Design a protein with these regions (language model features):
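C-terminal output helix
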Residues: 22, 114-123
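The C-terminal output helix
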Residues: 124-138
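Conserved phosphotransfer microenvironments
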Residues: 59-81
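Acidic, metal-coordinating helix/loop segments flanking the phosphotransfer/catalytic sites
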Residues: 42-60
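Conserved acidic segment of CheY-like receiver
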Residues: 7-28, 61
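Hydrophobic/aromatic residues positioned on beta-strands within the core alpha/beta folds
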Residues: 89-91
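Alpha4 helix (beta4-alpha4-beta5 surface) of REC/receiver domains from two-component response regulators
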Residues: 93-110
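A generic structural motif
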Residues: 31-40
Length: 138
């Protein structure tokens, strides 16, 4: 994938606009120098997230575990229902919620308050994994 004209689509879900903005600012325009630029699609409702995932075209998903309905439940639903589901970064508020993130089958987890470097590095790793394992289009 050429980074000159390619774009990575990142879905960000939270019912809190401030959380969505923090995620967007942490990742920035390009999560790492070796990766394409990021394009964000932001949603505050579960229905909109599932509709977007059904349409496809998302490379990485960032879900707020504290949103209503919870991002961890949405993660589990996406992993169960979406063919070739993109990797998911779950945001949890409490360390003790780690077991829920495991149950949800999230690919990575970060805690709140958000550490911008941790978010960007984790998203970059998920994107690299997605690129490396992407199914070829015939």
């Amino acid at each position: 994938m050429s980074t000159a004209d390619a774009v990575i689509k990142i879905l960000v879900y939270s019912d809190n606009a401030n959380t969505r903005a923090q995620v967007r600012l942490a990742i920035g325009r390009r999560p790492a120098a070796d990766l394409p630029k990021a394009e964000f699609v932001e949603y505050a409702t579960q229905a909109a997230v599932i509709e977007q995932l059904d349409r496809g075209g998302v490379d990485v998903i960032v879900l707020d575990g504290e949103a209503r309905p919870g991002g961890l439940g949405i993660c589990r639903q996406a992993k169960d229902e979406i063919y070739d589901c993109p990797p998911v970064l779950a945001i949890i508020a409490r360390r003790d919620d780690g077991w829920l993130a495991t149950w949800s089958r999230a690919d990575a987890v970060v805690g709140q308050p958000l550490d911008p470097m941790a978010v960007a590095n984790t998203v970059a790793d998920l994107i690299r994994q997605r690129i490396a394992t992407r199914l070829p289009v015939l």
